[in-house]
Amino acid sequence: MAAAAEDVEFVDYDRDEEEEEDAMDEDDRGGGRGGRALPVPHIVSQGVMRSRGRLLGRSTSVLASNRDRFDSLADAGNPGHGPQRSIEGWILLVSGVKEDAEEDDLYNTFSDFGHVKDLHLNLERRTGYAKGYALVEYESFEEAQTAIKAMNGTQLLTRTVYVDWAFSRGPIQKLTSTRPLHRRSRTPPRRLAALTC
């Protein structure tokens, strides 16, 4: 079966415009049958690569210059780390929300720190209970900062909630990590090795 797969030739039914014009000229001269001629398959060698798309025919220097270009919002005033303002306002992520919490509970709690522009509490479809997090939006940075300082690590409906910025500027991994940098071994830990034997 493997030998038969190597002997197969690839057939291309796409025709170039010039070949189509030549075939039409032959039909007009009466070289063909009375009807329209059937397409003739062209055999394509395996060495030819067909490519399509936006980057076809571009030089490698153009491709290399566009490789690392991304859309971004430049903030010349504060290029460092910290919170990032969304289009509407300053959005906080509240995690650790109790399952039976309602939007009114969160709204009443967070409205003490300023005008809550929007509040979204995600609910589980099957049960109707909260998924455990909420998004709270404030108009001003000061109100959001006050809410974070006051509510982070406090009790809300007998559960400890953690409040932080939903969007932040800077790298994904902080330069000063709390975990020590050490090489990981490729061998499995002893507790897993005992289970496999």
From Swiss-Prot:
List residues of the RRM domain. Answer: 90-168
What are the alphabetically sorted keywords of the record? Cytoplasm, mRNA processing, mRNA splicing, mRNA transport, Nonsense-mediated mRNA decay, Nucleus, RNA-binding, Translation regulation, Transport
| Protein location | Nucleus; Cytoplasm
As given in the record, the signal peptide range reads: none
Q: Does the keyword Translocase apply?
A: no
Q: Where is this region: Disordered?
A: 1-39
PROSITE patterns membership: RRM (PS50102)
Please cite one Gene Ontology biological process associated with this protein. Answer: mRNA transport
The record, for InterPro entries, names: Nucleotide-bd_a/b_plait_sf, RBD_domain_sf, RNA-bd_8, RRM_dom, RRM_RBM8
Which SUPFAM superfamilies does the annotation name?
A: RNA-binding domain, RBD
Which molecular function terms from Gene Ontology are attached? mRNA binding
Enumerate the SMART domains for this protein: RRM (SM00360)
Q: Where is the composition biased (Acidic residues)?
A: 1-28
GO annotations of cellular component type? cytoplasm; exon-exon junction complex
Q: Where is this chain primarily localised?
A: nucleus
Q: Which CDD domains match?
A: RRM_RBM8
What is the top-level taxon of the source organism? Eukaryota
Family listed: Belongs to the RBM8A family.
Q: Could you tell me what this protein does?
A: Core component of the splicing-dependent multiprotein exon junction complex (EJC) deposited at splice junctions on mRNAs. The EJC is a dynamic structure consisting of core proteins and several peripheral nuclear and cytoplasmic associated factors that join the complex only transiently either during EJC assembly or during subsequent mRNA metabolism.
Under the subunit heading, UniProt states: Heterodimers with MAGO1 and MAGO2. Interacts with EIF4A3/RH2 and RH34. Part of the mRNA splicing-dependent exon junction complex (EJC); the core complex contains MLN51/CASC3, EIF4A3, MAGO and Y14.
This chain belongs to the protein called RNA-binding protein Y14B
